[in-house]
Amino acid sequence: MKVLDRSAFKKTINVYSIEIKPNQINNLNKCLKNYYFKNRRCKITEEKISDNVKLFLNPALIKNFDDFSENTKIELKNLGITKDMFSNEIITLDYDYWKLNEVLKAILPKDEPPLTSYSIIGHIVHLNLKDHLIDYKYIIAEVLKDKVSVAKTVVNKTNKIDNVYRNFEMEVLCGEPDFIASVIEYDTKFEFDFSKVYWNPRLSTEHNRIVNLVNHGDVLFDVFAGVGPFSIRAAKKNCLVHANDLNPDSFKWLNHNINLNKKAKGWITTYNKDGSDFILNDFKSNMLKIWSDSNFLGQIHVVMNLPAKALSFLKYFKGLFDEQDLKEIKKDHLEKHLPIIYCYFFAKKDESLDEIFKTHLEYKFDENEYEFNFVRNVSNGKNMHRVTFQMPLSILMIDNSDISEPLPKRISKSLKAKTKAKEYTGNLKKIKETLNKNISKIDSDFLKLQNDISKKKEKPDDK
């Protein structure tokens, strides 16, 4: 079936039923509740007949009185319920009765994998249909709109998320092309245009994990903030947040959502930049302010949720600070407040997470200095992971050969080294000049010798 025919789902069945007075229901429930024909949207478990109520029993369990267990028969007898009070009745089940998976099972090919998942974003049902289901996309969408109570619009993703803004093209299969979605994640409301920004409801648990690590007095840098699932909830905990996203639509809805959630206002500064620019400039300048504040007692968190590319942005932390930047900062205060990085990435199931991570950062961590966490399955061959680690000062510094020494001492050594280097350069220049002069003299003497030998050969033999 490729065109939905709701009438095809009508079915008549024979059910065992009993008509009783309303005041008998509670007592009868005690012995018959496990036998009731369960209600599914349509009211067939019970039907009011004048002042009485008719109860229907599940035909898969009870077809006649003899199907009751002996204990149930005794309980019915004690309630004054006899066999004569039961009867068989024909009822009709229509399209509304059947569950979503039952309808899809009836209309889709039996020899192909079924529809396994879909996402709900406000009133939007989002599909990512496999190739073998494309021919059935419209009927699938229609059934979803019927059976998912909040559904008003059903869309299918038509391309991969491979553009710089992380959104994707989609096709409206059923309903109105209304993409302004409203969702509540835990205690926070978000609104956005789903066709222009990235939102994945399957990440709500991961958002919550990170937010639970953030406390009042902390600072969070959200490098790829999107519409704010990490940032806004962190700000509501009175954590100072710097939230950045390159996508102008994400930036727009990020600010909109800050206004929606009043508790977050005043705690977030927003940026509309490339992640590299944000790290090289805004992260750096704000880190220097934090490190310069001897009263700062919190933790610094950096969230990098761009799994397709986030690892490649780690290089922008390398050598971000030089000795001149840090000369006024106390070393012990600095080392107590190094940023904790939460970086997301994709990996094929047969790939080494260690190799992927270390290749991008090119730093030899000890095993206990970083941690991998599985986030979700993306496809049959790919998973999403998070690596969590504290960024070493030796990565953040340009010249880290003497990182263990106090900063003033290192600066002094650096200046001495520069002076010595100049001396060595001058000496090398002198040596080179002397060597060149010697080589020229040797060449000149050699040419003179050749000329003398040549002249002797030209003289006649006196003998």
Swiss-Prot record:
- One GO cellular component, as annotated: mitochondrial matrix
Q: Which family does it belong to?
A: Belongs to the class I-like SAM-binding methyltransferase superfamily. TRM5/TYW2 family.
What GO biological process, any one, is recorded here?
mitochondrial tRNA methylation
From what organism does this protein derive? Pediculus humanus subsp. corporis (Body louse)
InterPro entries recorded: MeTrfase_TRM5/TYW2, SAM-dependent_MTases_sf, TRM5-TYW2-like_MTfase, TRM5/TYW2-like_N, tRNA_Gua_MeTrfase_euk
Q: Which domain of life is it from?
A: Eukaryota
Q: Which keywords label this protein?
A: Cytoplasm, Methyltransferase, Mitochondrion, Nucleus, S-adenosyl-L-methionine, Transferase, tRNA processing
Does the record carry Transit peptide as a key word? no
Its localization reads: Mitochondrion matrix; Nucleus; Cytoplasm
First-tier enzyme category under EC? transferase
Which function does this protein serve? Specifically methylates the N1 position of guanosine-37 in various cytoplasmic and mitochondrial tRNAs. Methylation is not dependent on the nature of the nucleoside 5' of the target nucleoside. This is the first step in the biosynthesis of wybutosine (yW), a modified base adjacent to the anticodon of tRNAs and required for accurate decoding.
Q: What is this protein called?
A: tRNA (guanine(37)-N(1))-methyltransferase
Listed EC numbers: 2.1.1.228
Keyword presence, S-adenosyl-L-methionine: yes
Positions that bind S-adenosyl-L-methionine:
207, 245-246, 274-275, 305
Which coarse location class describes where this protein primarily resides? mitochondrion
Q: What chemistry does it catalyse, as a reaction equation? A: guanosine(37) in tRNA + S-adenosyl-L-methionine = N(1)-methylguanosine(37) in tRNA + S-adenosyl-L-homocysteine + H(+)
Q: What is the lineage of its organism?
A: Eukaryota, Metazoa, Ecdysozoa, Arthropoda, Hexapoda
The UniProt entry's coiled-coil ranges are: none
Q: Which GO terms describe its molecular function?
A: tRNA (guanine(37)-N1)-methyltransferase activity
Tell me the subunit arrangement.
Monomer.
